[in-house]
Amino acid sequence: MNEPIEVLAAELPRVVRWAGALARQLRRHDIAVGGKHSGSADTDALTLTDLSVQEILVAALRDMGPTVRRCRIEAEEGTGDLGRFAAESEWVLAIDPIDGTREYRDRIGHRYAVMLHARTAETIHYSLVFLPEEDTDGTWLEVRGDRIVLGADDPARTARAVLDALPPVVPAPTRASRRILVSGFLGREAERARAVSATGLDGVLGAATPGSLYPLMASGYLTGALFHTPNVYDFPVCMHVARALGGEAVWVHDGKRVDFRRTWRDERANMIRLPGIVACASDRSALATLVDVAREWSPERYR
């Protein structure tokens, strides 16, 4: 089951570090690109960096050998030698070259990230996230099975050595945070966050948080997330973190465990999404509350 994971864990960190350095440098220039028209400012943001970073990541994955090329690629953008990978495979490698493109493009924050994860239809097996401008030299998040590491980069050492030296995040028996990130409810996010807060949890919007979803989940600042039709490029990392901490991700309409056997293509945004509303939390009691509050909300993204 772990066939590509050994190769990815050994080879990918240095490439992601290089991609992060490129993103830091390109951000100083006029790199905005048009072409997306879904109606969501976050979804429609696109830069030359997204395209360039994906080109690098795909080329590096291609050159890792046949084990990796036998995987299927799901990439947020269309650049790179994607035809070298399997059209059908048990394994999927999902790439978000720049998560948080709008803030990256507009230079209004430092929580953008280079992300990749490996999954099967059942669950996520490996996730790697690098935030180039968090901390002095960037911040790493790696999830491998149930082991999470989170911490600062050190360019004096190899990327793999840095990750190996980071202490694992230990799941707390109970986490003090009740914060739930609410996202994807087009035009209704504030309303949905208030509904979550009315249950005793603390529904928050992305703009009100001090960083990226993924390290905030791993550190315990956020206990979970409630997303409408999340995409398959970045949100699965949130699911992976939650599960590694002893939590879960479920569909709110029936409370069943989320897998990747059912997806749909959002033609407006030109991306693949999970259907319906997904609740994800490291605290399973919070999950039950989220299912109760959101069960009757519309699963349709565009109405």
Predicted stretch roles:
Residues 1-14, 194-303:
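Oxyanion/phosphate-interacting regions
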Residues 76, 130, 228:
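Conserved residues at the C-terminal ends of beta-strands
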Residues 84, 149-176, 254-272:
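Charged, glycine/proline-rich intrinsically disordered loops and linkers
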Residues 123-124, 148-151, 155-158, 284-288:
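Short helix-loop capping/hinge motifs at secondary-structure junctions, enriched
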